[in-house]
């Protein structure tokens, strides 16, 4: 039997080995085919890039020709515009001169017209005054002639007193007439002064208008002078530049310009090739983004499927609990039936002694004692049954509470999964919007910082002692990294992640200087740790970590707590050991570059 079992196991082992070999061969074939496809893709991409570069070069040459023709057209159009501007300037100057001459003539004619108006007003006023004087003199003459006639008539018939009074009256009338003439003269003088004042006011208004016009002309002259100065300065600068170019000995030859033109053409070709490469890389990046978007959508759908699977598991668990409770109920019903049978038997047994009580009056004392004990036992059994029922009720309450808590936990887990799926969908939508509205992102190149290691120099140890200590320190430093890598590999088994961990440790060499035999120039080991996760992008890795960190049940929560406590204990222990290892030694800074002879790769 054992030999048959061993033979079967050996056959199974051979079959598994053959299957593994076949799987390895298929994997190698797939890898080779993938490499061939990648090489073909690279070749096609290079061909496309060369073709695009040639097309871009042709496009650039055509653009240059078009630019030259456009420049020629622009130069011709600029010449036409300059001629038009010159003609416009000439016309504007002619218009300005004609307007000025016309304004001057109009002003002269206005002056003459005003002078003629003033003379006409003066002549009219003098004529009016003279007419008024003539009328007044005629009235005086008529009144005097009448008075003379009256005086001659009265002189003959009137006495001397009346004559004196008449003489005085005539004198007073003469005085009155003289005063009246003076008043008229003053009125005439006032009218002349008013006319003169009006003429002067007109002249003042006219002079103000002329002053404003002269000020405007002065402002226009000043603006034209400033423009002429600016134009003169520009022309002077152009003249100075032309003189400097004429005096510059380097500008006389064409070799420098040809070299500059060649360099410019080479740089433009390089720029075109870089643009083509940039466009191809941009398209590749967009394709990778689309793939990432699809993966995120698939992860969201998987999360939704996981939520539905959790519902099915919960339903199965509830059905199992229901079956268990039904079995318990059946068992309790059977016990109740047995107890009813026992009770019926006990009642029948009690009825029989009651019927035969007359015959058994002379029973012994032991029967009474047993009866008392039986009664006590019945009472105790009843009390125990009551306590048992109370405990059963308590157990039912606790089970009900546990069921309620499990329901709440399940609802919370379902809400969590739904929120995770919605979060993934929102992230996918956000990435789509970013791709639409923010297609170009600024890529920040990470700056590599050089590390400087601190080595003790006071203790002079030989090479054989230094090397093991350094190796021990490096192993100690590598141990937490190995633990983290193991934890990552254990956690990412579901996603089929391949963890590649390369650690290159460069051995340190000790060189003694020829002049100082005591000082040691020690080159420390440089640790290069790089952990690469192939097959899954960073977003999927973060999502897998989140999905691992989300507790799906109390058992998983307890396990995660235990893992955290263990990790914290390990971290504290490593910190304490590092603090104990660190001592106050004088530091020396050594270059972190390692030679190819001293490198020792480890995996």
UniProtKB/Swiss-Prot annotation:
Keywords: Acetylation, Cell cycle, Cell division, Centromere, Chromosome, Coiled coil, Cytoplasm, Cytoskeleton, Kinetochore, Mitosis, Nucleus, Phosphoprotein, Ubl conjugation. Residues 561-577 have a biased composition (Basic and acidic residues). GO terms for biological process: cell division; cell migration; establishment of mitotic spindle orientation; mitotic metaphase chromosome alignment; mitotic spindle assembly checkpoint signaling; protein localization to kinetochore. GO terms for molecular function: kinetochore binding. Monoubiquitinated with'Lys-48' linkage. Deubiquitinated by USP45. Interacts with KNTC1 and ZW10. These interactions appear weak and may be transient or indirect. Interacts with dynein intermediate chain and dynactin (DCTN1). Interacts with the catalytically active form of USP45. Required for the localization of dynein and dynactin to the mitotic kintochore. Dynein is believed to control the initial lateral interaction between the kinetochore and spindle microtubules and to facilitate the subsequent formation of end-on kinetochore-microtubule attachments mediated by the NDC80 complex. Also required for correct spindle orientation. Does not appear to be required for the removal of spindle assembly checkpoint (SAC) proteins from the kinetochore upon bipolar spindle attachment. Belongs to the Spindly family. This is Protein Spindly. The lineage of its organism: Eukaryota, Metazoa, Chordata, Craniata, Vertebrata.
């Amino acid at each position: 039997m054992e030999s048959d079992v061993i033979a079967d196991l050996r056959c199974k082992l051979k079959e598994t080995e053959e299957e593994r070999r076949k799987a390895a061969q298929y994997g190698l074939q797939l890898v080779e085919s993938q490499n061939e496809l990648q090489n073909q893709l690279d070749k096609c991409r290079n061909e496309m890039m060369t073709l695009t570069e040639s097309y871009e070069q042709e496009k650039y040459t055509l653009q240059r020709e078009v630019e030259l023709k456009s420049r020629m057209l622009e130069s011709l159009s600029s010449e036409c515009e300059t001629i038009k501007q010159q003609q416009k300037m000439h016309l504007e100057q002619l218009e300005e001169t004609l307007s000025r001459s016309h304004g001057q003539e109009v002003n002269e004619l206005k002056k003459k017209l005003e002078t003629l108006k003033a003379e006409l007003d003066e002549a009219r006023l003098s004529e009016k005054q003279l007419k008024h004087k003539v009328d007044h003199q005629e009235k005086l003459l008529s009144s005097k002639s009448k008075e003379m006639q009256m005086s001659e008539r009265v002189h003959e018939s009137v006495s001397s007193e009346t004559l004196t009074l008449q003489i005085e009256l005539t004198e007073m009338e003469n005085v009155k007439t003289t005063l009246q003439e003076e008043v008229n003269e003053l009125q005439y003088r006032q009218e002349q002064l008013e006319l003169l004042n009006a003429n002067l006011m007109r002249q003042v208004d006219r002079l103000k208008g002329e002053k404003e016009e002269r000020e405007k002309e002065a402002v226009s002259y000043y603006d034209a002078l400033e423009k002429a100065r600016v134009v003169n300065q520009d022309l002077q600068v152009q003249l100075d530049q032309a003189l400097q170019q004429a005096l510059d000995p380097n500008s006389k030859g064409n070799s420098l310009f040809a070299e500059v033109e060649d360099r410019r053409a080479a740089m433009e070709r390089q720029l075109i090739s870089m643009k083509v490469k940039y466009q191809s890389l941009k398209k590749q990046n967009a394709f990778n983004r689309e793939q990432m978007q699809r993966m995120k959508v698939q992860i969201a759908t998987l999360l939704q499927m996981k939520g539905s699977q959790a519902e099915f598991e919960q339903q199965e668990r509830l059905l199992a609990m229901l079956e268990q409770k039904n079995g318990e109920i059946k068992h309790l019903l059977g016990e109740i039936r047995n107890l009813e049978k026992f009770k019926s038997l006990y009642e029948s047994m009690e009825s029989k002694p009651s019927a035969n009580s007359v015959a058994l009056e002379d029973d012994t004392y032991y029967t009474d004692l047993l009866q008392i004990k039986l009664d006590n036992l019945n009472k105790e059994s009843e009390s125990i049954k009551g306590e048992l029922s109370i405990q059963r009720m308590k157990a039912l309450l606790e089970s009900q509470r546990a069921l309620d808590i499990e329901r709440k936990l399940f609802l919370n887990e379902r809400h969590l999964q739904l929120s995770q799926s919605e979060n993934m969908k929102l992230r996918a939508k956000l990435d789509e919007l970013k791709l639409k509205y923010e297609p170009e992102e600024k890529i920040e190149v990470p700056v590599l910082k050089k590390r400087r290691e601190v080595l003790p120099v006071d203790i002079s140890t030989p090479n054989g002692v230094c090397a093991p200590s350094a190796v021990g320190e490096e192993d100690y430093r590598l141990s937490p990294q190995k633990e983290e890598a193991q934890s990552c590999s254990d956690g990412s088994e579901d996603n089929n992640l391949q963890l590649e961990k390369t650690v290159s440790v460069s051995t340190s060499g000790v060189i003694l200087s020829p002049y100082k035999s005591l000082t040691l120039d020690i080159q420390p080991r440089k640790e290069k740790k790089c952990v690469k996760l192939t097959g899954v992008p960073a977003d999927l890795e973060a999502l897998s970590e989140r999905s691992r960190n989300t507790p799906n049940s109390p058992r998983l929560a307890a396990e995660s707590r235990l893992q955290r406590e263990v990790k914290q204990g390990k971290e504290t222990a490593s910190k304490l050991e590092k603090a104990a290892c660190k001592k106050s030694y004088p530091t020396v800074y050594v270059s972190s570059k390692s030679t190819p002879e001293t490198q020792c790769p480890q995996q």
